[in-house]
A protein has these predicted regions:
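Carbohydrate-associated surface elements
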Residues: 172, 193
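Conserved acidic donor-binding segment of nucleotide-sugar-dependent glycosyltransferases
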Residues: 321-322, 326-333, 342-347
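Acceptor-binding helix/loop patch of EC 2.4 sugar-transfer enzymes
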Residues: 41, 58-74, 114-154
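Aromatic "clamp/platform" in nucleotide-sugar-dependent glycosyltransferases that forms part
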Residues: 289
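Conserved donor-binding/catalytic core segment of Leloir-type glycosyltransferases
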Residues: 203-233, 242-244
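Nucleotide-activated donor-binding/catalytic signature segment of Leloir-type glycosyltransferases, i.e.
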Residues: 252-272
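Short hydrophobic beta-strand element within catalytic cores of glycosyltransferases
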Residues: 306-309
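Short alpha-helical donor nucleotide-sugar binding micro-motif in glycosyltransferases
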Residues: 160, 268, 276-281
């Protein structure tokens, strides 16, 4: 079987590429980032092709803080369309194309004309559903609505219609597609894995402190205001809340209204630095109102750090409530505060949750279960027989 991938930047697609390569399925992965960045993903260069100039330039300009939203929107739209045109010209015949959502429409049609299958890989909820949730949250906090990008919804929905299948990382994401009219039989839930070689326990949380961690984009979509309000209610003489990640523009006008005592913002950290923070934290809290399946949950669990999360994070596909952590309703400040207080006041509970986390991620086999589920889906869609000999990675 020959499988090709298209992806903006990296996301989880290089983990998938490794799984496909080990099974002998990977033909090529096309990315909009340069090889200088992609080589750290550890995939042989012969499998990687890049269309990097436009995306790299847009990213660098964006980091200056001087790129107007309208210009950023135009450049990203241009990048999306030209990347799709480029991959459509370059792609060799294959049995299946896996494209991160937003990419691959023209390329997918070409693959289908040549007898292959086109799979849209969506990392979060349905685009229209997502935009409705985020717009409502902006209104709730008196923040101007997000810059309208109707072309994104139009393109995404055209891709959903064209694709032979849509993969999502969680049941909650699949439900959003069904709510927006996509047939359930077109959807396939394939939860993400975790790199156990990079995320593992390296420290023990300080028993004299209560360290709470948040990791990810620090904005309204991630439910950050609810975490700050809840943390302020936690009673502990030496409590600390650390935010790892970049503060989003939509939160900047809201932050001054929120309690921030004993709160630290570190900015973005490297994966080794993040793993160290996770190992040293008593709990990670992710109160998102919309997501797909937050990778940081599995990463924290692999470090022995219990998780408090909302269903919107995809938590229900990753861990069990009151076993490896706690699942609380979205926007529920009382529930967040109660569960944090529980862990702060009961070291034995925290230890039980931590040990359960390590058992759970070990059972997932890193990214291997993810690869197995993709292997099953690809064989089902293409109808191609499995190799009679098991691949070497199982030996």
């Amino acid at each position: 079987m020959r499988v090709t991938q298209t992806v903006f930047a990296v996301f989880h697609h290089f983990e998938l590429a490794h799984q496909l390569q080990r099974r002998g399925h990977l033909a090529k992965i096309y990315s909009t980032w340069p090889w200088a960045r992609l080589k750290r993903e550890g995939l042989p260069k012969e499998f990687v092709e890049t269309f990097a100039t436009l995306h790299t330039a847009t990213t660098l300009l964006g980091r200056t803080g001087r790129l107007p939203v309208s210009a950023d929107t135009f450049l990203n739209k241009w990048n999306t369309l030209t990347f799709d045109n480029w991959t459509a010209r370059r792609i060799a015949p294959c049995d299946a194309l896996i494209s991160i959502s937003g990419s691959g429409l023209k390329t997918g049609r070409k693959v289908q004309r040549e007898g292959g299958k086109f799979i849209c890989d969506r990392g979060s909820t349905h685009q229209r559903y997502q935009e409705q949730i985020v717009a409502a949250e902006h209104k709730r906090w008196n923040v101007p609505p997000p810059y309208e990008k109707p072309h994104i919804v139009v393109r995404e929905e055209a891709i959903y219609e064209q694709a032979d299948a849509i993969s999502v990382p969680s049941t909650v994401a699949a439900r959003s597609f069904i709510a927006m009219g996509i047939p359930a039989e077109k959807l396939h839930v394939i939860p993400y894995g975790v790199r156990l070689d990079k995320f593992k326990p390296t420290a023990v949380p300080d028993p004299s402190r209560f360290d709470v961690l948040f990791a990810g984009a620090i904005g309204l979509r991630k439910g950050v205001p609810y975490l700050l309000e809840a943390f302020a209610r936690v009673k502990h003489p030496n409590k600390h809340l650390t935010f790892v990640g970049a503060v989003q523009d939509d939160l900047r006008s809201v932050l001054p209204r929120l309690p921030q005592q004993h709160v630290t913002f570190t900015g973005t950290l490297s994966q080794p630095e993040l793993a160290a923070r996770m190992s040293a934290s008593h709990v990670m809290v992710l109160p998102s109102i919309e997501e797909g399946l937050a990778l940081v949950q599995g990463q924290a669990m692999a470090c022995g750090c219990p998780v408090i999360a909302t269903p919107a994070t995809g938590s229900e596909d990753l861990f069990t409530h009151d076993v490896e952590g706690f699942i609380v309703p979205e926007r529920d400040i009382d529930a967040l505060a109660t569960r944090m207080q529980q862990i702060a006041g009961d070291p034995a509970l925290r230890q039980r949750l931590s040990e359960a986390c390590l058992r759970r991620v070990k059972s997932l086999g890193g990214w291997d279960r993810y690869g197995d589920l993709w292997d099953d889906l690809l064989h089902t869609l293409t109808g191609l027989p499995r190799d009679p000999v098991e691949p070497d990675y199982i030996l």
